[in-house]
Each structure stands twice: as structure tokens, then as C-alpha cells.
């Protein structure tokens, strides 16, 4: 047998063996051989993750160089939200969304929302010059970043520590009313300042009345009392700003004045005894007819006595929340940082929530509401957009009480260059505070959603798995009867199943953005970004400072001095005429049906 014949026989044998193996395998179907790979043309879903080129096109890539930033070098020229990162050698490249968007971050307690996400974002905000507000339950963020923001980035820093009010900066919520009233009083021709004082007085009154939640529609038949109470509050805030001493012009003085004005007074000019009138009506009678405070209080002033008392009681009930000796140390003095300074200069406001005292949580809602409304006024003065982007880092957004009008904030603020980053632990928190419709409005207006690190029993993981969508994958079945067979088909499979979401490693998050495919985004611990902390930012203990209030008598005296022509004297004839007014005679019944 020649060598060529031998080679041919061997080749034929090999082919025969391969055919036998192929025949065996074709009849030995296994379920393990069916892989869930992407197939088809999107018949059951087109969900997929973004490609590298799509990520590069969607997000700005910024070198995250903390060392140089803190020296004032190579500061970023873009502003926005840090949503992810990638490593390039020893350098870290941040993925930044520079759009006017709101962000919703969802993650269970302990997944690293602060260490992985919040700290890099605050560092970037400081480096890019964005003013920001940050809520903090532990106080760690302001202690770590207060000094850095002030020392390296030249920020105005204000800490409102509701846990330790004597170690807190002041926040007089009437500050802007007082400021513009002083400008107007120094120049009576400056009507713009007067109008701003009136506008901020109405904003403050509306914010206070809405502390309890609801609006005119929710109050139903009682809507009149709440609307009238709002006008009454605005009226007294204006009067306090106009006539009060500098250290008396605060919200607790308003409470005291309303309480005092409930008491009846008798005019000293009366010759004979007459029925006493309420202190509130006596005060309003001393004002000129064209005084705006009198107009604002018109609903209450022209109501029946009982209705007017109900209006004043409604206002008092809303102000009860401010009656706290510790809170007075924050509310009754100056203001470290107002809305105008916050928008025009690099500024940071840290609000510390006491986890052990939920009775003070309303202040967070109040501060955010008032600051937001005042920012809108500033934006309108600048053509509808702020000159510099403002960030609200609302950590524990689902923990503190409902922010009245939060749905409108998420809907309307984006176009004004206000970005809200709401950090929650689950959708159930939003549902509890804002209801099903409120939750949907908030989630529908957050163009960025970042999530990861779910608890084993998390229901939010199911919601987000569904939100990621489905992809078309291969599936099939195998039969091992008399004749072995296999069938293949296309099915829809979630892009990430619930168990895959729950088993994601710490530091890995999913980022979804409107109009783009989602991406798996790794985030590093803050020290791997190059972030280091220095000495903690601590405010000095100011001690218990004496609080002064404006009294009803002082206010009436100042009004009489300013408007002496409004003093009224009641003549003896007028009083006699009032007393001798004939009573309605009762007509006797004479019969009939």
C-alpha cells in the first residue's frame, strides 16, 4: 500500500468518525445548549445597554483632578451631574451630564449613596462654581466639605443645624422683606424695592400656610379661612418690616402680635362706654386706606367677627410650629445667606436634620419651599434663567415631610437652571408622602435615574427591572421521546432581571436617561476619586441669645406716629346715636295658619 493510499484511508476514517459524532450530537439535544443570546429584530423588545460610542456622545468626559482643582488650576468648564466614571491609567475620568435635568437616585440604606455618589458630585459642584443646597441627617457632609468649599473654592458657606441650633448659622425667613423695606424707607421713590418687599412677604406667607400640606382645592369649604390667613400673615409681616426694630423683625414676633391682636381694645378717645373691638380692627383703622397691608388683610378685616377670629386662629395654628426656644436661635436674628446672594455668588447651604426629633423636619420643607420661590423671582428678573446653575442635593428626600408644591418644582424649575437631585431608599417613600399621582409626576420629570444596591425584599427592584425594558433573546425546548427533537423560538427577556439587580456589586449603578439607552456605571469610593478631607467644619457655640419681640402696643404707637391723620375721635352725639338705635320690634301674631 502506497503512502498516498494510506493517507487517503486515514482521511476517510476521520471524516467518517466526525459524521458519526455529528449524527450523535444532532439527536442528543440538551437544554444547556440553548443560550439566551440576543437574536431577531426586536420582535419582543429592543432594550439594550448603550455602546461606548453612545456613552461618549451622551456624557461629557471630564478629568477629575481634585489636587489641581483645589489649587485653582484646570477647573472644569462644564456644569452638571456626575453619573459615572472610568479609569485611564491612574487618572479618573468623570462622566458628566451637563443638561438641565433632574435626577432621582434610588438605593437601600448602606449602599454608598453618599460615599460613591454625593461626595464626588459636591466636589465637582465646588470646582465648577455651582451654588448648591444639601440636606444631611448625620452632619457628616457639612463637617467634611464646609472647610473645603470655603478654603479652596472661596464659597459662602451657611450651615442650618436643626440638631444644634446654638451652633448654627441664622436664617431669618423675613430677611428679604426686611431688606427691601429698609431700602424703600430710605428712598420713598424706590417703588421697585417696595414691590419686592410685598412680593417676598406674600411668598413667605404662602409658604407658612402650606406647611400643613394641601392647597385651596384640598381645603374645600375651609379654603376661605386659609386664603384669608395667608393675606393676614403677609399684612403683618409687612407692618413688622416697616415699623419694627431691627432685632424684633422675625416670624415669632408675628405670632406674638396675632395673639395680642385677638384681645379686644377700647378706644381711649371714647366719651362713653362702647362695645370693645378687636385689636386687629383697631390697628387696621389707624392705617391709611391705600396702605397695602390693609388691602392684604381685607378678607379677614371685612368678615364677621367670628369669621375674623377663625382666620386669625388659622394663622396662629400654622405659626405654632415656630414656637421653640432652640429654634428661635436660628429664626430670630440675622441671615447668613439669602436667596439673592445664593444665586449670584458661589454659595453652599447645608441643612442638618435631627433624626431623633422629627418635629423640626418641617423647617427643611419650609426652607426649600421659600428658597425655591425666591429663586424663581430672581430667575424671572434675569429673563427666566439663572445666570449660574443651582443644585439641590436632597439627601433623604423621602424621609422629611412633603414639600408642598414639589411636583411643580420638578416640572418647572429645570428651565430656570435649577437641578434637583432627590436621593431616596425606595419608591414607597415617595408614594407615602406625595401619593400615587405625586410620585408619578416626580418620577416622570426626572430625566436621569440612577439606581443600585437593593435589599433582598425590595419592591423597587421590580419596578426598575420593568422600566429597563425587554430584549429579544433565543429560547427553546427539547424532547427526548421516541424521536428526539428540539425547537427554538424568540422570547422577551428583561434587560436585567430582579435578581440580577439585587445581586449587583457595591459601587455599581445603572444610569437611565431620557432618549438614550441605559448604561452600567461604576462609581468609586470618594478617596479613589482623589478626594480627601481636612479639619472638620465646626461653628462656634453662640450660646442662648436673648430674643426680643415687637408688642401690639409698640406697633400701634409707631403707626399713630407715622400716620397721625388716621386718629379717630368719637363724639358724644355719635355714641348716643349708636346706643339709642331702636331695636327691631317684634310683631305680635294675630292668628291664621
Where are these regions (language model features)?
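Low-complexity, intrinsically disordered or weakly predicted helical/coil tracts enriched
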Residues: 32-37, 41, 150-152, 173-181, ...
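Conserved ATP-driven motor cores of ASCE-family P-loop NTPases powering translocation/secretion/packaging/pilus
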Residues: 410-510
